[in-house]
UniProtKB/Swiss-Prot annotation:
Belongs to the dCTP deaminase family. It comes from Corynebacterium jeikeium (strain K411). DCTP binds at K101, S102, S103, L104, G105, R106, D119, T127, L128, E129, Q148, Y162, Q174. It is an enzyme of class 3 (hydrolase). The gene is dcd. Keywords: Hydrolase, Nucleotide metabolism, Nucleotide-binding. This is dCTP deaminase, dUMP-forming. It comes from the Bacteria. It holds the Pfam family DCD. It catalyses: dCTP + 2 H2O = dUMP + NH4(+) + diphosphate.
Amino acid sequence: MLLSDRDIRAAINSGELKIDPHDDQMVQPSSIDVRLDGLFRVFNNSKYTHIDPKQPQEELTTLVEVPDDEAFILHPGEFVLGATLECFGIPAHLAGRLEGKSSLGRLGLLTHSTAGFIDPGFTGHITLELSNTANLPIALYPGMKIGQLALFTMTSPAEAPYGSGTLGSKYQGQRGPTPSKAYLNFQN
C-alpha cells in the first residue's frame, strides 16, 4: 500500500523513517521530493576500452564536486552518477520507489536507468543514474528537486532487510554517488 502524506509524516515523526536533512515542505501527497547533491561521478571515457562488469575498474569514474552556486552541465547523450542530498534510513516494513520529476522529464532528463527500487533496511544517499536524452545540454543545480521517493508498506517486515549481513548489501551506508560494484556479483 502506498503511503500518503499523512503516513509519511507519521513515519518521520515516530523515527521509523529517517531523512537527513528533512524539510517538511518536501512531503507531497504520496511521495517525498528529493534534491540533488553537489557530487557527481563522471565516466573516464579514455581510461578503458570497454566497461567490464566482472572487473572493479576503480578508475572508471572520477568524483566531481560542484559548488552550491554553480551548475553541472549534462550534455546530450551523457550519463553520470549523482546522488540525493538527503540520506535515508528505510525501516524493515517499508520499500521505496524513486521516480523522476515530471517537469525535468519533459526537458529530457532521466533520473535512473534501472535502479529505482529502494529495499527495506537501506540506509544512505540514493545514487542517481542521470541521463540527458534531449539534444541540448541541461544545467543541474545542487539542491534542486530531482525526483520523488514513494514509499510502500509491505505485508510484513522483511526477515533479512538490506544491510542485515545475510545479503550482499554492497551499497549500504553509501555517501554520494557510488560507482558500480557489479564485480562482487561474480565472486563466490
